[in-house]
């Protein structure tokens, strides 16, 4: 019982701290800094530094879900989708959930787009234990 109470308090405190963290992104400057400095600035400082950092309005997990859905729906299956799939996994979207999300998207955005997304998602979630979600594994580690 004490472990459960301690875990609950820790989770609440951690979520409050996480909600206040500013997302730091340098991919724009790293990849496009001298070629397209304004775009790099907007990517790093506005999109990630401001929009993604408004976690008090919409959490990172939900932002990841919206972003993945948008990219797949547009047929974007390049390194940007891989990056956002990796972020989604870090933000708590499980292997089971991503499979269901992509399946659902397939009916609305197109079957070939879902196939392409599955090929990338399999790589991101390849090391997950078969039949287990990241949440379950994380919860087991915390006990």
Predicted regions mapped to residue ranges:
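Positively charged n-region of N-terminal signal peptides that target proteins for export
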Residues: 1-4
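A cross-kingdom feature marking solvent-exposed beta-strand/loop segments within repeated
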Residues: 79-103
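Acidic, glycine/proline-rich low-complexity segments that act as flexible tails and inter-domain linkers
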Residues: 20-62, 82, 90, 114-143
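Short, structured motif recognition centered on aromatic/hydrophobic residues
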Residues: 62-72, 81, 98-102
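Short helix-coil transition sites and intra-membrane helix breaks within transmembrane domains
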Residues: 74-79, 110-113
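C-terminal binding/interaction regions
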Residues: 104-105, 109, 117
């Amino acid at each position: 019982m004490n472990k459960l109470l301690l875990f609950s308090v820790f989770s609440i405190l951690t979520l409050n701290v996480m909600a206040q963290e500013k997302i730091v992104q340098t991919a724009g400057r790293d990849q496009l800094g001298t070629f397209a400095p304004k775009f790099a600035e907007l990517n790093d400082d506005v999109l990630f530094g401001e929009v993604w950092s408004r976690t008090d309005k919409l959490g990172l997990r939900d932002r990841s879900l919206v972003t993945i859905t948008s990219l797949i729906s547009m047929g974007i299956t390049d390194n940007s989708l891989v990056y956002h799939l990796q972020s989604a996994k870090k933000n708590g979207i499980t292997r089971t959930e991503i499979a269901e999300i992509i399946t659902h998207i397939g009916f609305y955005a197109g079957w070939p787009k879902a196939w392409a997304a599955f090929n990338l998602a399999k790589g991101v979630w390849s090391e997950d234990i078969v039949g287990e979600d990241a949440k379950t594994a994380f919860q087991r580690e915390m006990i």
